[in-house]
């Protein structure tokens, strides 16, 4: 296969399809989503057979249980796909909305209209559910998309792509609006991220090594996040019960997600009251604690152990594991300084009953999501009321935080006049 020619052809077809998608009606887009949902229900057995072949090859390669779990299309996973498609269909269509329409002294009206981005390239690991999630969001937001999933899910993605194409055709929309890259060759990624003529934005959903590669090689703009080094700062004016709940959930609800707390900052004024019960809670849940000298002193006195001395590298680390770094700080200023220096601009939270301190934290912490008295685990498109998300961005342009339908659109200015000329 000539990868360069193959990817160029995908791009050309996607660009052509994007024009039809931009003018597609809400009814047609919803009909396509419903048709795909019904096709998945109808062909569940065939999908599972294709997926079983992918899973068998992954097992033969010795891939770990967590990887196999993400790859597997169980009955529950298929049901979740179907529910997700219907949920996206139920969301309000942002395309064509006009906002901020105002009369100007000249007599013209000026506003902004929400429009699709165009062609979105999505690069992700071997998770077949992302094929459906991404296709649904791109379709509803009026975009065409080129999907490049992990090589271990080739057969699963091909089977899903066939059903997506059928759904688009049934709704009178171009099948090229959703195309799945049908090769495991890594050169396909290299070509996709440089096709500025055909691709408007890349959304990578993968590990740190993938994101780092794309940062170095991509010519197409990206919506991305590299790390999720999330913090909770417990202020000395915090409610202790709230602090225990937030700190427990932020770390132990799920270890392997990008919105899990990786560093706990504790004000020196509340450390003696908070750390002993919290340390015992983490110990009982087998969370390894990497602590600074001040935290060690308090925890050791309370009989909490074992403890590992934290190094500077710990403040920079996204563990994605039952490991937590703990540091005692002098107060709010020190906490904000630490977060802005070591954090990844993803999600950070403060626990406090002091309104002024809470507002300072919200203003001064330079992250995509900033929270007061709530777990960092809430940084999620569904929890934020977006309905669904394509990913989370800790960049400042174009979208920031969980990226839902609106994040896959942009605004253009529209002017309504009555024959006016500029004086």
UniProtKB/Swiss-Prot annotation:
Major location category of this protein: cytoplasm
Subcellular location(s) of the protein: Cytoplasm
Reaction catalysis annotation: L-glutamate 5-semialdehyde + phosphate + NADP(+) = L-glutamyl 5-phosphate + NADPH + H(+)
UniProt keywords, alphabetically: Amino-acid biosynthesis, Cytoplasm, NADP, Oxidoreductase, Proline biosynthesis
EC number: 1.2.1.41
Coiled coil start-end: none
InterPro entries in the cross-refs: Ald_DH/histidinol_DH, Ald_DH_C, Ald_DH_N, Aldehyde_DH_dom, G-glutamylP_reductase_CS, Glu-5-SA_DH, GPR_dom
Lineage, broadest ranks: Bacteria, Pseudomonadati, Pseudomonadota, Betaproteobacteria, Burkholderiales
GO MF, one annotated term: NADP binding
Keyword Oxidoreductase: yes
GO CC, alphabetical: cytoplasm
Family: Belongs to the gamma-glutamyl phosphate reductase family.
Protein name: Gamma-glutamyl phosphate reductase
Biological role: Catalyzes the NADPH-dependent reduction of L-glutamate 5-phosphate into L-glutamate 5-semialdehyde and phosphate. The product spontaneously undergoes cyclization to form 1-pyrroline-5-carboxylate.
Domain of life: Bacteria
GO terms under biological process: L-proline biosynthetic process
Taxonomic source organism: Burkholderia vietnamiensis (strain G4 / LMG 22486) (Burkholderia cepacia (strain R1808))
Pathway the protein contributes to: Amino-acid biosynthesis; L-proline biosynthesis; L-glutamate 5-semialdehyde from L-glutamate: step 2/2
PROSITE patterns listed in its UniProt record: PROA
Gene name per UniProt: proA
Pfam families per record: Aldedh
């Amino acid at each position: 296969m000539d990868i360069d020619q193959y990817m160029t052809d995908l791009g050309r077809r996607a660009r052509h399809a994007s024009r039809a998608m931009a003018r597609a009606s809400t009814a047609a887009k919803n009909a396509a989503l419903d048709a795909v949902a019904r096709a998945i229900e109808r062909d569940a057995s065939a999908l599972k057979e294709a997926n079983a072949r992918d899973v068998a090859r992954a097992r033969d390669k010795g891939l770990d249980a967590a990887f196999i779990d993400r790859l597997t299309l169980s009955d529950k996973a298929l049901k979740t796909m179907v529910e997700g498609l219907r949920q996206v269909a139920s969301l309000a269509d942002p395309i064509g909305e006009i906002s901020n329409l105002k009369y100007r002294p000249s007599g013209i009206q000026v506003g902004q209209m929400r429009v699709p981005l165009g062609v979105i390239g999505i690069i992700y690991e071997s998770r077949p559910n992302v094929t459906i999630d991404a296709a649904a969001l791109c379709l509803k937001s009026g975009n065409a998309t080129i999907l490049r999933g992990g090589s271990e899910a080739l057969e699963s993605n091909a089977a899903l792509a066939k059903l997506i194409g059928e759904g688009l055709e049934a709704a009178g929309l171009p099948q090229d609006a959703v195309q799945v890259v049908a090769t495991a060759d890594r050169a396909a990624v290299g070509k996709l991220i440089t096709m500025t003529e055909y691709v408007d934005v890349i959304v990578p959903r993968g590990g740190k090594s993938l994101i780092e590669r794309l940062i170095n090689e991509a010519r197409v703009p990206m919506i991305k996040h590299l790390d999720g080094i999330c913090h909770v700062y417990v202020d000395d004016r915090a409610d202790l019960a709230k602090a225990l709940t937030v700190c427990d959930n932020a770390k132990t609800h799920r270890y392997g997600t990008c919105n899990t707390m990786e560093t706990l900052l504790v004000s020196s004024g509340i450390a003696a009251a908070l750390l002993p019960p919290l340390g015992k809670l983490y110990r009982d849940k087998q969370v390894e604690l990497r602590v600074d000298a001040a935290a060690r002193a308090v925890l050791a006195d309370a009989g909490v152990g074992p403890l590992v001395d934290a190094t500077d590298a710990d403040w920079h680390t996204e563990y994605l594991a039952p490991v937590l770094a703990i540091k005692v700080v002098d107060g709010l200023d020190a906490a904000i300084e630490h977060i802005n220096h070591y954090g990844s601009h993803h999600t950070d939270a403060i626990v406090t009953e002091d309104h002024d301190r809470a507002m300072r934290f919200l203003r001064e912490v330079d992250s995509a999501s900033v929270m007061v008295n709530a777990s960092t685990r809430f940084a999620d498109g569904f929890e934020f009321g977006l309905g669904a998300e394509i990913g989370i961005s800790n960049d400042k342009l174009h979208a920031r935080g969980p990226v839902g339908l609106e994040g896959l659109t942009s605004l253009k200015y529209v002017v309504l006049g009555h024959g006016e000329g500029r004086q």
